[in-house]
Amino acid sequence: PELHDSVQLIQIPSLGMFETEDRMKLFSLKLLFRPLDLYEWITVMTGGFPEPYTYGKRVYKYLKNNKKDFDIILDNQSLCGSLLKIQDLLPLAVTIHHPITKDHKLEMQNASNWKERLSSMRWHNFLPMQKRVAPKLNKIICVSAPSKEDIVKEFLVEDNKIEVILNGIDINRFVPSPSDSVKANRIITTASADIPLKGLKYLIQALPEILKSFPKTTLTVIGKAPSNSEVSKLISNLDLKEIISFKSGISENEIVDLYHASEIAVIPSLYEGFGFGAGEAMACGVPLIS
């Protein structure tokens, strides 16, 4: 993360299963004597996402041993079971951007076969934990009024436990371009994950029609290039590889430059708790379709 000089980063150790494609090499007989690490390895290898659970276990152990160093804990939607113990240790506020049940439902609706549905169910195996934990939290922060409504509905949280604090855009960084840097016919979009919720496939499906009227159109996607997914297959089938570029692992300043170089921004998301991409585009003075 990009941190201010005054902010200390404390890294909680993990196996780093999502930092490598060769996950088999992370296995060793030592894992047999480290139950949490073994659980993490087995869960990932069988298509699950254990991090909300395993992170919670590890961070609780750290906070229990270093309680005196902290005044308040802010959790960014891990919604791990250990939060219920942490809020007994220290004052705790939890941010929920939106209930991930929304992501899961959209994935199930867009699944084309039983394998994809089974895969989505396995990946989202942390949802029962989140549904159990959320109603028991003392204070929740969410990022928009619609998000609050969905948290109440999906997680059965009492309305008076939730405070709406809108996400902020750094308007000293995301500013209109001071120069004429716009490149004609360039569209920009954001896709922080290759999931149906982001709606990227709908924008890609529209590109052939756009190209009929604006043949020099290009699309810049702020996000990782998908591999072996519906979106990647769609790009290949429509022969759009030459006009679509993906940008990931870049700084906020580089993101601002990309907005400045774009003629229009399109945010095709089916659902967002807040929608940073739309806010950033508007702050940069880029015409927006969302």
Q: Can you describe what each PLM-predicted range is?
A:
Residues 229-253:
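Nucleotide-activated donor-binding/catalytic signature segment of Leloir-type glycosyltransferases, i.e.
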Residues 180-198, 204-207:
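Conserved donor-binding/catalytic core segment of Leloir-type glycosyltransferases
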Residues 287-290:
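Short hydrophobic beta-strand element within catalytic cores of glycosyltransferases
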Residues 249, 257-262:
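Short alpha-helical donor nucleotide-sugar binding micro-motif in glycosyltransferases
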Residues 270:
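Aromatic "clamp/platform" in nucleotide-sugar-dependent glycosyltransferases that forms part
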Residues 2-58:
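A conserved catalytic-core segment of Leloir-type glycosyltransferases
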Residues 146, 168:
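Carbohydrate-associated surface elements
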Residues 61-64, 117-140:
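Membrane-proximal helix-turn-helix segments that form the acceptor-binding/catalytic region
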